[in-house]
Structure formats: C-alpha cells, structure tokens
C-alpha cells in the first residue's frame, strides 16, 4: 500500500528528479479510480464548469459548486494530495475574502491545498494565504479565468510576453507557493522557468521539461469530443463505449430481453 502524498513529498520529488503526476477529478468514483492509478495529486479543477456542467468557460463556477466537488473527491480518501481550484473572484476581491474562501476549501471541503490563478498581480494574495498556513499551488501562463483578456485560449509567453511570465512564476514562488502550474506556454520557456525555480512546475501544454504534468480526466478518457487541445493525449476512448452501452440498454428494454429472471427477485 502506498503512503499518503504530502506537500513535503511533492517538494522532495523535484529535488530527486521524480516527475509529479496530476489528474483532475470532480466526483467520488473518479477520485477513487485515478487514485488507484497512482497519481500524486488530484486537482479538483474549476474545469468542472466546462466538462461537468457544460459551460463555455470556467467563469460561472461558484464557491459552493467547488465545495460540492471537493467534498465528493475527499470522501474517496485518496492517497494523492487533494488540491482545490479557487474559482473566479474567490480571491480577487482582497485578502480577507481570499482567506475566508481558501479557508473554507480546507475546513469545509477537506482539501489539502488550493490553486490560485495569476502571477505578480496575485502575489500579495498568495502571500497572505500561505502565511495563514494554507498551502497554495500557483498557476501562470494561460490562465483560463483570464480568457476574455487573452481573447480566447491562446498560447502565452511568445516574444515579449516571455519575461512577464518568468516574472510571474518567480513572484508566485516568492509569495510562498509550493508549486506552480505552467499552462499553454512554449516548451523552451517552461524549461527556463523549471530550471529557475526551486518549487516544482506542473505543466499542461508546456512541454516535457516541467517537473510534472496535469491533464483533465475527461480529455484523456475521450469524453470531450467537441474540444481536444493539442497538448492532450487520449489514453482511452470511452465516449463510443458509453453510447453503445446506452444503445444496447434501450434496445433490450424495448424488445423485452431485459430484465430477465437473472435480474429479478423471487
């Protein structure tokens, strides 16, 4: 039986050159399954707003919705570290509101860390939260909560943007984050940041040099057919299997071949 993954263990993994593996989960059964697969951390992402609730982006996701998902994941008692995404505007309104909301994720939700999007602009908030012993994972580069400012989900850090993202990553580390997600940036830039920082970098669309990788579970299982980013590798194709199972069920109920005596009580 593997041991519980903690934040010191995540930090040690970078020091020892061991890759950190992260997948998202939003419910109890999925959390159990990905944990059994051996992931080091489960991110309860605000991506739930898109892949679970059907929104166009993550902006509509609320604190109450995130707490619902976090509680469901925590009930699986995973060995993986549980990190809760802070939804849009949960931390942007100031330190007091950020502390209250991040505290709820740990106290009510049972998460072991939170993830806050933003770089230098959010460093004071990250510092205030970490000083209250709430562990923070940062997130720089392509930050989905900034989708309108970026004009869509576009690669960040090309040309003159590179130095800004380097500064953002450094600011997040200096503010006390234990790790930082690098999303949607050139692989060479991610490699520079990874070499520069003492904390682990977790890449998503940021190349192979990062200290770890994170992907959305629905993407690797082929459950989001309408949108598949370049950086996603599909490890299973469950969508047609689910559709076919539903089709067989409908057919058997309609023609009377289900349920049979085997599925009935005497």
UniProtKB/Swiss-Prot annotation:
Catalyzes the reversible reaction in which hydroxymethyl group from 5,10-methylenetetrahydrofolate is transferred onto alpha-ketoisovalerate to form ketopantoate. It comes from the Bacteria. Belongs to the PanB family. Signal peptide: none annotated. Keywords: Cytoplasm, Magnesium, Metal-binding, Pantothenate biosynthesis, Transferase. 3-methyl-2-oxobutanoate binds at residues 46-47, 85, 115. Its EC number is 2.1.2.11. Homodecamer; pentamer of dimers. The active site is at 183 (proton acceptor). This is 3-methyl-2-oxobutanoate hydroxymethyltransferase. It is an enzyme of class 2 (transferase). One of its GO terms (cellular component) is cytoplasm. Binds 1 Mg(2+) ion per subunit. PANTHER family: 3-METHYL-2-OXOBUTANOATE HYDROXYMETHYLTRANSFERASE. NCBIfam families: panB, PRK00311.1. Its cofactor is Mg(2+). Pfam families: Pantoate_transf. It is found in: Cytoplasm. Pathway: Cofactor biosynthesis; (R)-pantothenate biosynthesis; (R)-pantoate from 3-methyl-2-oxobutanoate: step 1/2. GO terms for molecular function: 3-methyl-2-oxobutanoate hydroxymethyltransferase activity; magnesium ion binding.
């Amino acid at each position: 039986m593997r041991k519980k993954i903690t934040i010191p263990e995540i930090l040690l993994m970078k020091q020892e050159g061991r890759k950190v593996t992260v997948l998202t989960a939003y419910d109890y059964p999925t959390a159990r399954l990905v944990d059994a697969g051996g992931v080091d951390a489960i991110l309860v992402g605000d991506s739930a707003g898109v892949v679970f609730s059907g929104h166009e982006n993550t902006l509509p996701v609320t604190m109450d919705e995130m707490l619902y998902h976090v509680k469901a994941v925590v009930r699986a008692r995973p060995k993986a570290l549980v990190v809760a995404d802070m939804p849009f505007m949960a931390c942007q309104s100031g330190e007091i509101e950020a502390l209250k909301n991040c505290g709820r994720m740990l106290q009510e939700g049972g998460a072991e860390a939170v993830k806050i999007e933003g770089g230098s602009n959010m460093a004071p908030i990250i510092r205030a939260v970490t000083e209250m012993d709430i562990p923070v994972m940062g997130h720089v580069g392509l930050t989905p909560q900034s989708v309108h400012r970026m004009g869509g989900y576009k690669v960040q850090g090309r040309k003159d943007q590179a130095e800004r993202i380097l500064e953002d990553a450094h600011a997040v580390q200096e503010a006390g984050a234990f790790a930082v997600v690098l999303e949607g940036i050139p692989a060479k830039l991610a490699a520079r940041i990874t070499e520069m920082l003492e904390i682990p970098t977790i890449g998503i669309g940021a190349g192979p040099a990062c200290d770890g990788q994170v992907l959305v579970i629905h993407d690797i299982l082929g459950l989001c057919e309408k949108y598949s980013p370049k950086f996603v590798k599909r490890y299973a194709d469950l969508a047609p299997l689910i559709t076919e199972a539903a089709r067989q069920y409908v057919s058997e109920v309609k023609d009377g071949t289900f349920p049979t005596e085997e599925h009935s009580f005497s």
